[in-house]
Amino acid sequence: MIYDFEKNIPEVHSEAWVAANATIIGKVKLEKNSSIWFNATLRGDIENIYVGEGSNIQDGSVLHTDPGYTLKIGKNVTVGHLVMLHGCTIGDNSLIGIGAVILNNAKIGKNCIIGAKALITENKEIPDNSLVIGAPGKVIRQVTEEEVKSITENAIHYQNNWKKYSESIF
């Protein structure tokens, strides 16, 4: 469902996809080829939420903000199942693993992998090309060229997959 909130109407690109039971509220902008999967919630009732071109927000994820903390997701980002993003910035071509939590004013660089169940605390900055695991999250190494390629391939998979869903079930 897509809801306006206090006269703020979500902007959904004509070539983006929102699952029927996902919830998009208020100050949310979805760019071309982005996809919002089942039971995900993007609650733009306080600050802006921006989802970049080709990015996917997978099932059960929650995106929200606090006053003064917008949420920005770059291009070709994969946000895995059950992720919590709160007032943070995610760089292009990054992958946020299943169940990860990223808090206010955290900044994730480009081409990063944030491991499943990782916790990125407030104000933490993760450099480009980092692999992060743990709670609290720690950079354990740089990602390989093969891993960067895999992140891109995963985003492309979801760009193709939402089109199949839009043709098959709606």
Per-segment meaning from a language model:
Residues 5-6, 10-127, 131-132, 137-139:
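Structural signal for interior beta-strand "rungs" in well-ordered beta-sheet cores
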Residues 143-146:
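Strongly charged
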Residues 157-170:
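Charged phosphate-binding loop/patch that engages nucleotide di/tri-phosphates or the phosphate backbone
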